[in-house]
């Protein structure tokens, strides 16, 4: 919808998507480095990916610390705000791709409960997160996929109208 009002390049679209998924991928970097360096088995990556709170695989303290702080920093509105200000002054054309990161933070704040990886959006001031609805609850997943299908159909219909 934004592209109907502002010209967005394919590079910007790619940047939006990349920055939308980056916060959840970034925390794997220390684990990948540790595994690649021979410190742990490859299975740790899978175990970490499917872990529930309290059931994460045992990692060396430095790896655990880096994973934790990368997760917090990547999900922080304060960190994203500081980066956005820097980008605004140094590379304003990169502001559109930052929408991906901001959308990730906003969605995570409301789709993570206190019991299931709360999103620390005010890090480094506090680790507390908003007690939202856990994204893995059945009712949320059903609602989510129904809304995605409805939006996809709406975009398909409006795109056909614009094209003709």
Whereabouts are the PLM-identified features?
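N-terminal membrane-targeting hydrophobic helices
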Residues: 1-164
């Amino acid at each position: 919808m934004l592209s109907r009002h502002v010209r967005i390049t394919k590079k910007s679209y790619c940047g939006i998507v990349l920055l939308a998924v980056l916060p959840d991928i970034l925390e794997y970097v220390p684990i990948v480095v540790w595994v690649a360096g021979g410190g742990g088995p490859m299975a740790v990556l899978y175990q970490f990916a499917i872990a529930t709170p309290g059931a994460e695989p045992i990692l060396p303290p430095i790896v655990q610390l880096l994973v934790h702080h990368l997760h917090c920093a990547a999900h922080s509105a304060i960190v994203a705000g500081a980066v956005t200000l820097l980008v605004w002054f140094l590379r304003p054309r990169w502001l559109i791709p930052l929408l991906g990161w901001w959308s990730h933070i906003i969605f995570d704040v409301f789709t993570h409960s206190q019991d299931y990886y709360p999103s620390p959006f005010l890090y480094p001031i506090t680790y507390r997160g908003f007690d939202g609805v856990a994204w893995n609850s059945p009712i949320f997943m059903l609602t989510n996929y129904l809304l995605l299908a409805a939006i996809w159909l709406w975009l398909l219909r409006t795109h056909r109208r614009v094209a003709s």
